[in-house]
A protein has these predicted regions:
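N-terminal helix-turn-helix DNA-binding core of bacterial DNA-binding proteins
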Residues: 1-37
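Short, hydrophobic-biased segments on the C-terminal half of alpha helices
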Residues: 42-46
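Beta-hairpin "wing" of winged helix-turn-helix
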Residues: 48-62
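Short alpha-helix boundary/capping motifs
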Residues: 55-57, 73, 97
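Basic, amphipathic "hinge/linker" alpha-helix immediately C-terminal to the N-terminal HTH DNA-binding motif
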Residues: 60-83
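Amphipathic alpha-helical dimerization/coiled-coil segments
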Residues: 77-106
Length: 106
């Protein structure tokens, strides 16, 4: 899995409560992603068997069904591993030099 910013944010949202089912709008808010980014990402995670999904039957007439997503057991394991590796890479990355102050020679 390629660990991009959106992937990292979605996995972090899932891992805040790994057993809890999450629906799309909930994940959009938690990960701060637009639907055009989130849903293709969820589809890829499903294809990789890291996320499972199920449709909820509306309880009242007129309610729209919701599709709930949940990390699989393997998804939890991979998400934790990938997030730990991403964190370690950030800690090892050399600090980026700052810009010199205006008028300085540096």
């Amino acid at each position: 899995m390629r660990m991009t910013g959106p992937v990292e944010r979605v996995l972090t949202a899932f891992l805040s409560d790994p057993a809890a089912p999450r629906y799309g709008y909930d994940l959009m808010k938690a990960a701060r992603l637009p639907s055009g980014t989130l849903y293709p990402l969820l589809a890829r995670l499903e294809q990789q068997k890291l996320v499972g999904s199920a449709w909820e039957t509306p309880q009242q007439e007129g309610e729209r069904p919701r599709k709930y997503y949940r990390l699989t057991g393997e998804g939890v394991r991979i998400a934790r591993l990938e997030l730990a590796q991403a964190s370690a890479r950030r800690q090892r990355a050399p600090a980026r030099p700052g810009r010199p102050a205006p008028g300085s020679l540096g």
